[in-house]
Amino acid sequence: MASKRDLVFRAIRGDEVERVPVGFWFHFVTLEEKGQGLNNPRIFQKSVDGHRNYVERIRPDFVKIMSDGFFLYPSNVYSPKVSSIQELVSIESIGEEHPWIQQQVEVVQAIRKTFSVDRKSVV
């Protein structure tokens, strides 16, 4: 039997596989928490623990990591009041060193570290 990584990549290439790979994506924070991850260790840990527990229980072939808590770009333009696409032109980059970017990288790295070697085929 192929490793999970081989199974997933063989299926993506269209090669014959012994079974269809199974994966998931799931959000582990509440709707209210989806934009409150910046500088919030509770939401950070909730996302890490949620991914780890789900993967241990379900044992999927691949996982789509969710950077829960970071779904609202930190811009004064981004709001429910945007009424036309032209308004979005004024959104400026926060830069790759911004804590909103850096903390997303940290949460994804922490989630990835919880996976066993066989599941390192995260897609």
What function would you assign to each model-found segment?
Residues S83-T114:
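A gly/proline- and charged-residue-enriched helix-loop-helix capping module
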Residues R119:
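Short, basic interhelical loop/turn and adjoining N-cap
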Residues V122:
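Conserved small/polar residues in nucleotide/adenosyl-binding loops
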Residues G35-N39, N76-S93:
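Surface-exposed, active-site-proximal loop segments in enzymatic domains
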